[in-house]
């Protein structure tokens, strides 16, 4: 909720208000393993493009090289994250950061709870999201899931350079939107 006197979209933010805009996690990455597949995720359940070794791999090839959740273009805040004892399921509790525009709070931190659950198993890799609104009214904002695939060999991900590699073509859609 917005602190008393702190704008809920109608009042300006106090000069003493410290907005919650990001989370720094000191947790180690989560590694999911199933048969010839494995996934390396950050504690949020994200996969970043940077040379972190994160991704979803099958038979030594990285298929998914990016999977990132954004709320109004911003990363969520991490509340907690846990890997189950089978190393096939990770659960991350997330919330929204303060969304501020023009000195006014559009959505106060902790208004939304996001449960991000990620599974790796016989049916493949799956990530689901459940959102709960703890605010007094409806919330209308963009929720983006950014993803990419590079089909990199596991050794390339670790830093080995190939002499030749195929090129990435333009994105094609199977149907008109």
Language-model features: locations:
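Terminal accessory carbohydrate-recognition/targeting modules of carbohydrate-active enzymes
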Residues: 1-177
